[in-house]
A protein has these predicted regions:
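Hydrophobic "anchor" residues on beta-strands that sit immediately upstream
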Residues: 7-9, 61, 200
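Asp-based phosphoryl-transfer active-site loop
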Residues: 4-21, 212
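Short, solvent-exposed loop/turn segments at secondary-structure boundaries
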Residues: 20-23, 138-140
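Mg2+-dependent phosphoryl-transfer enzymes with acidic/Ser/Thr/Gly-rich catalytic loops
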Residues: 3-4, 23-24, 175-177, 181-239
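Non-catalytic pre-domain segments flanking phosphatase-related domains
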Residues: 1-10, 26-29, 33
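Active-site phosphate-binding/coordination module
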Residues: 21-113
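Conserved acidic, metal-coordinating active-site core of Asp-based
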Residues: 105, 110-200, 208-211
Length: 239
């Protein structure tokens, strides 16, 4: 007999919403129903406050930046209190030089805006189409992630001090080691007295290089969300 669940955790973009798009009413309603039975948690790649607002300020704890931000929902103020880990510094010129070499080698020399986005936490976004590319172009660039998976090993080799993920719709996310979603989930569960066998995770990016893959391969009960518009069907057994 399986262990009863106490916590259900979620990825955001591609799982509950389209990329960087507000949550739709039907998926918010599913979250509300799940919240009556389980402790809920967001485990995201992006900024915790951005995730919280993308969810329409839904009452939920939010882990951002692969665990470098811990956001706790405050029911009195209906807001998210965020504590951040100490930023991990990097040599920007060196990072940009490595990114330029990768672009030349892999054929991604045309881009709009910057090549790499440097987040305050120390997480980096290697934006193949550039930091100012149009959202429509990003969504159309690599929907099956095959272009990025083809060069994933080269990106991993170029940035050994980071965990590298096929992130978003057209980029790679680089999180300073040891930060990733598995590490973040394990730390949260330990603090809240929850065993990993009592947790489930819902995500869409569980394939090679995906930022949900580390959770999927950790043996955590995993719900594969292959279409965010069918999220409710995917988790129906939890309701």
């Amino acid at each position: 007999m399986s262990t009863p669940l106490k916590l259900v955790a979620f990825d955001l973009d591609g799982t509950l919403t389209q990329h960087k798009t507000p949550i739709e009413p039907q998926n918010r309603a599913v979250l509300e129903a799940l919240s009556q039975r389980y402790h809920l948690l967001m485990v995201g790649a992006g900024n915790a406050q951005r995730i919280f607002h993308q969810l329409g300020d839904f009452p939920i704890d939010v882990i951002g930046n692969y665990g470098m931000q811990q956001g706790t929902y405050d029911p009195e103020s209906r807001s998210l209190r965020v504590e951040s880990a100490a930023p991990v510094p990097c040599d920007r010129e060196d990072i940009l030089a490595r990114a330029a070499e990768l672009r030349y080698r892999c054929g991604f020399t045309q881009y709009t805006g910057g090549s790499v986005e440097f987040h305050d936490s120390g997480v980096l976004t290697f934006a193949l189409l550039g930091t100012e590319a149009a959202q429509a172009d990003k969504l159309a660039f690599d929907p099956d992630r095959s272009k990025r998976r083809a060069v994933l090993d080269q990106v991993v080799e170029a940035f050994p001090e980071f965990n590298v993920f096929v992130g978003g719709s057209s980029s790679f996310d680089l999180a300073p080691k040891p930060y990733d979603k598995r590490y973040a989930l394990e730390r949260y569960c330990a603090v809240h007295g929850i065993d990993l066998s009592e947790a489930a995770f819902c995500g869409d990016d569980y394939g090679p290089g995906g930022n949900d893959e580390c959770v999927y391969r950790a043996g955590v009960r995993f719900f594969k969300v292959d279409d965010y518009r069918r999220f409710g069907e995917t988790v129906a057994e939890l309701l």
